[in-house]
Amino acid sequence: MNERFRNILLDRDGTVIKERHYLADPNGVQLLPGAGRALRALLDAGHRLFLVTNQSGIGRGYFTLAQFAAVQQRLLQLLRQFRVEFTDTAMCPHAPQEGCQCRKPRIGLWEQLRLTHDLVPEQSIMIGDKIADIRFARRAGLAGSTLVLTGHGVNAARELGWSVADDGRSPTPPPHASDRPDQPDIVAADLAAAARWILTQPEQPPRDGL
């Protein structure tokens, strides 16, 4: 296992499960293809998994904390068939206008996990489908960040200057991407591709795109 990525922080909607607008119904939870097996492979290799999710639908009044909990239980139920469990989940329930410190890209959720589990940023990587996930990783000083092209990922990659086909294939970075602070370390088709990249990295992985 590459020690730089011992702790894997994962966005939920659009990364692990199918993106649905303000998901409040447990029946709407659907694992993205390959996600369960990818998480199992990471656990088998010794990584720890943490879910880090913004849920502003609570603060906006679109659904309740109890409904969020029901959705979470359904997710855990679906992952159980792959023998996957998260070490912990950190969730921000606030609407953007509340100005909290826990809504990504602010790093309150990282601080919560860091203090609870003695995490160090040099051994942690963030995987998500939004620019906020990449900025979160940068601000927390994490060892790496991965943008997946599921969920909002294609639009996020294009906003960052990447050339991406509508089907998410063949992402091409913008010129001098490695010098730009908001760029992910890699862009991957999905969580399964991101996991494969992590699992094959040497101790000092190069900055790359796939």
Regions found by a protein language model. Give the residues of each.
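Asp-based, Mg2+/Mn2+-dependent phosphohydrolase catalytic module
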Residues: 2-4, 66-87, 96-126, 130-210
